[in-house]
UniProtKB/Swiss-Prot annotation:
One of its GO terms (molecular function) is ubiquinone binding. HAMAP family: NDH1_NuoM. The chain crosses the membrane at residues 4-24, 37-57, 87-107, 113-130, 134-154, 167-187, 211-231, 242-262, 272-292, 313-333, 334-354, 386-406, 417-437, 462-482. It is found in: Plastid, Chloroplast thylakoid membrane. GO terms for biological process: aerobic respiration; ATP synthesis coupled electron transport; electron transport coupled proton transport. Its main location: plastid. It is a multi-pass membrane protein. Keywords: Chloroplast, Membrane, NAD, NADP, Plastid, Plastoquinone, Quinone, Thylakoid, Translocase, Transmembrane, Transmembrane helix. It catalyses: a plastoquinone + NADH + (n+1) H(+)(in) = a plastoquinol + NAD(+) + n H(+)(out); a plastoquinone + NADPH + (n+1) H(+)(in) = a plastoquinol + NADP(+) + n H(+)(out). The keyword Chloroplast applies. It comes from the Eukaryota. It holds the Pfam family Proton_antipo_M. It comes from Triticum aestivum. This is NAD(P)H-quinone oxidoreductase chain 4, chloroplastic.
Length: 500
């Protein structure tokens, strides 16, 4: 048992160190860049050390617990703790944020503010994944919005203000329902608010109230995940944001919705989740097909990748809705797998469009010859995204498939139908990804452009790509490494649904 406040340090360090950026000497952007990257690296190393030496994988209970009284008036505590569900997400956050700060190297305008916002976002994400108090969870959920809004509206494309406003309206609208749910849960059945997750797990509610609470939380997560029809902010946002912001959005922000769905809706409201789960599976299946076919019609290749993200989120929703050991583990695996693959595809799309100043597929063609490295990595990650065996996407989708098929909750006919729909979605994925690769990289179009001096990716970009490629291959070959983190915790969680 470790009594050292590891998690508090992990949550507070980035935002505290980030606020010191403004006091650094004005000697160009180099100082700020190196300072930010060293903070991210330090945070990631601390995180890895704490989890390696102070976290027991065999123990399905909450570990590294911290509980400090914060606001006395209504008994609000700073409660942190992690288990197998949050461990993978926290490590993913550390890994992707460190590489995203390295990806943001070319940013020179207002770089201090940019890096501060990235570090503030880092704190919010770690805080969300490790909070054990419902109100603290909500505060961290909201802490995320402001940095993302500013990163979008200040360092984006031509329509950045439109997409930033759309993002804030959608997410703030979802947060209203979230807050109502938090207050309803905290105030039910007692005079003073009790928001401790440990206490709320044992709380039971009247059926109508539980369904209303579930629905309130679901709307907030449906915006973040996103679940159709609340997904329309995502393509606009990804189309306009700087690619380092896109890495954080695709890699971590979307996963917060899935994490909330498991952590709050599944754990605290099991009866309502049992009722809603068939609908989640149906929506997930529709989402896979709908987003894949919409992606096929996108002219802007950034938006095409954004819709592919929405499609892949469908597998997570199906895994969560299947209420089986295998399905939920598959959903957690897909959270990590898509975190790596989605972030890298946006990074590649951003670096490619920065070089060519073009985003429409019909204007592109023939870039594989001047940019062979970008072409190779783009093809490799597209293969990972379309679930090529040997890469993480394949394992995650396969495990979700098995989870749905073995689910005792669904009859054979609906299972067969949904599996068939998922299979069609998996066939559509290579169609839109390979057609995008063909239009971008093959042909001869760009050689007719005057002074076409394209530069291939340099050592910094290759370093980022290879760093992410290794875990994608690693998870694809040996998924047990990731599954072992969550398997005991998932079993404990599902014992509420199927009592022994």
């Amino acid at each position: 048992m470790s009594y050292f406040p590891w998690l508090t340090i992990l949550v507070v360090l980035p935002i505290f160190a980030g606020s010191l950026i403004f006091f650094l000497p004005h000697k160009g952007n180099k100082v700020v860049r190196w300072y930010t990257i060293s903070i991210c690296l330090l945070e990631f190393l601390l995180m890895t050390y704490a989890f390696c030496y102070h976290f027991q994988l065999e123990d399905p209970l909450i570990q590294l617990k911290e509980d400090y009284k914060w606001i006395d008036v209504f008994d609000f505590h700073w409660r942190l703790g992690i288990d197998g569900l949050s461990l993978g997400s926290i490590l993913l956050t550390g890994f992707i944020t460190t590489l995203a700060t390295l990806a943001a190297w070319p940013i020179t305008r207002n770089s201090r503010l940019f890096y501060f916002l990235m570090l503030a976002m880092y704190s919010g994400q770690i805080g969300l994944f490790s909070s054990r108090d419902l109100l603290l969870f909500f505060i961290m959920w909201e802490l995320e919005l402001i940095p993302v809004y500013l990163l979008l509206s200040m360092w984006g494309g031509k329509r950045r203000l439109y997409s930033a406003t759309k993002f804030i309206l959608y997410t703030a609208g979802g947060s209203i329902f979230f807050l109502i749910g938090v207050l309803g849960m905290g105030l039910y059945g007692s005079n003073e608010p009790g928001l401790d997750l440990e206490r709320l797990i044992n709380q039971s509610y009247p059926a109508t109230l539980e369904i209303l609470l579930y629905f309130g939380f679901l709307i907030a997560y449906a915006v973040k995940l996103p679940i159709i029809p609340l997904h329309t902010w995502l393509p606009d946002t990804h189309g306009e944001a700087h690619y380092s912001t896109c890495m954080l959005l695709a890699g971590i922000l979307l996963k917060m919705g899935a994490y909330g769905l498991i952590r709050i809706n599944m754990e605290l409201l099991p009866h309502a989740h049992y009722l809603f789960s068939p609908w989640l599976v149906i929506i997930g299946a529709i989402q896979i097909i709908y987003a894949a076919s919409t992606s096929l019609g996108q002219r802007n290749f950034k938006k095409r990748i954004a819709y592919s993200s929405v499609s892949h989120m469908g597998f997570i929703i199906i895994g969560i809705g299947s209420i089986t050991n295998i399905g939920l583990n598959g959903a957690i695996l897909q959270i990590l797998s898509h975190g790596f693959i989605g972030a890298t595809l946006f990074f590649l799309a951003g670096t490619a469009s920065d070089r060519m100043r073009l985003v429409y597929l019909e204007e592109l063609g023939g870039i594989s010859i001047p940019m062979p490295k970008i072409f190779t990595m783009f093809s490799s990650f597209s293969m990972a995204s379309l679930a090529l065996p040997g890469m993480s996407g394949f394992v995650a989708e396969l495990v979700v498939f098995f989870g749905l098929i073995t689910s005792p909750k669904f009859l054979l006919m609906p299972k067969t139908l949904i599996t068939f729909v998922m299979a069609i979605g998996m066939i559509l994925t290579p169609i839109y990804l390979l057609s995008m690769l063909r239009q971008m990289f093959y042909g001869y179009k760009l050689f007719n452009v005057p002074n076409a001096n394209f530069v291939d990716s340099g050592p910094r970009e290759l370093f980022i790509l290879i760093c992410i490629f290794l875990p994608v291959i690693g998870i694809g070959i040996y998924p047990d490494f990731v599954l072992s983190l969550s398997v005991d915790r998932v079993e404990a969680l599902l014992s509420n649904y199927y009592p022994k």
